Design a protein with these regions (language model features):
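Metallo-beta-lactamase
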Residues: 2, 6-9, 13-17, 22-24, ...
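Active-site metal-binding motif and surrounding structural segment of the metallo-beta-lactamase
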Residues: 47-86
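Extracellular/periplasmic metallocenter environments
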Residues: 88-91
C-alpha cells in the first residue's frame, strides 16, 4: 500500500487518527492510534505519516477484519511490533454479519469504540451500517450492532470516516430506533 496520509490528529486520552484516500478502492481509509504508558496500539494502520516519529514501543497492530491488512506487516517490521487480535485494556466485540472476522474494540475508561467496517461515517451519507452488498449477513449485522446500545459509548473511531468525538451512543441509537 502506498498512500500519502496527512499528519496524526490527536483527539485526547491517548487517541489519534490519520487517514488518506485510496484510489484503488475509492474510499477514505482511516487508522487509529492509542498510546499509553504500556505502549502503542495501531488499529487498521495505513502508511505511517511522513515526518512523524514512529510510535513508542511496544507496538501492537490490530486488524478489525480480514480485509484490513493495509500496512500492518510493514509497520510491524518498522516498529518491531506484534500483529495481534487482542488488545490489553480493550474489550473485543465480534460483529458477525459484517465482513469476515469483523471485531470492534471498546475502551471502557474513555468510552471509546474503535470499529472497522460494521459502521462507516462518510460524506454525504453520514453514520450508517456497512451497506448490505458488502455484508455477509445484513440482518445479523444489525442485530450485532444493536447489542452495543448497552455500552457507554462516548467516542467512535472508524476505519472509514471522520471520528465522532462526543455523543457516540446517541448517534448509534438514532440508527436503531
Amino acid at each position: 500500500m502506498s498512500l500519502s496520509p496527512g499528519p496524526l490528529t490527536p483527539h485526547g486520552g491517548g487517541f489519534s487518527t490519520w487517514h488518506a484516500y485510496d484510489p484503488s478502492c475509492k474510499a477514505e481509509l482511516w487508522s487509529t492510534c492509542f498510546s499509553s504508558n504500556q505502549g502503542t496500539v495501531l488499529f487498521d494502520p495505513i502508511n505511517w505519516p511522513k515526518g512523524t516519529p514512529l510510535p513508542a514501543a511496544p507496538v501492537r497492530i490490530v486488524r478489525t477484519n480480514g480485509n484490513h491488512d493495509r500496512s500492518c506487516a510493514e509497520l510491524a517490521a518498522r516498529t518491531e511490533g506484534q500483529i495481534s487480535a487482542t488488545v490489553p485494556g480493550f474489550t473485543a466485540l465480534p460483529l458477525p454479519g459484517a465482513g469476515e472476522g469483523e471485531t470492534a474494540f471498546f475502551h471502557l475508561p474513555s468510552g471509546t469504540w474503535v470499529v472497522g467496517d460494521a459502521l462507516i461515517h462518510l460524506a454525504p451519507h453520514g453514520l450508517m451500517p456497512l451497506p448490505d452488498k458488502y455484508c455477509t449477513n445484513p440482518a445479523l449485522l444489525r442485530q450485532s450492532l444493536r447489542r452495543l446500545l448497552d455500552l457507554p459509548i462516548r467516542r467512535i473511531f472508524f476505519a472509514h470516516g471522520d471520528p465522532i468525538l462526543q455523543d457516540g451512543l446517541e448517534r448509534i441509537q438514532k440508527l436503531f430506533p
